Amino acid sequence: NCYGVWEEGFTSTEEDPRGVEADGNLDGKGPDHTPQSNFKIENMTIENLSKEAEMQDAIKIRRGAKATIVNALVKGSGLVTDLVDLKDGKGNADATTTISVSKELSQATANDVNGTGNVTVANGNTGVSTDTFAWTGYKF
């Protein structure tokens, strides 16, 4: 379970800020190294409420990483360029990457999916329940 939010007014000094980023090997220099990253995320929400910061990729998997992402939701009023990006100049995501994501964005993305993998973009995913984080006192 995870929830990432860029609040209204958030700015970033990064060249290519992302919601989640996963690499399989150090800077693409070890594609033959084993094991590579192979992980699962279940029940994830990424929310961009900032009109000042453009999220380059909501989900970026690259350089040999293999991801299984289930019940992901990307939402908000801020700009997200790529919903899911599986390509990189130093190595793409593992082709067996599987992602199920819904989007509730008020602005269109340039690309829903960039790269090769088993990515499903469809309505119906709920992401993580905010009740999970009630103990923090954060007001969603």
Predicted region positions:
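Extracellular beta-rich repeat passengers
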Residues: 1-140
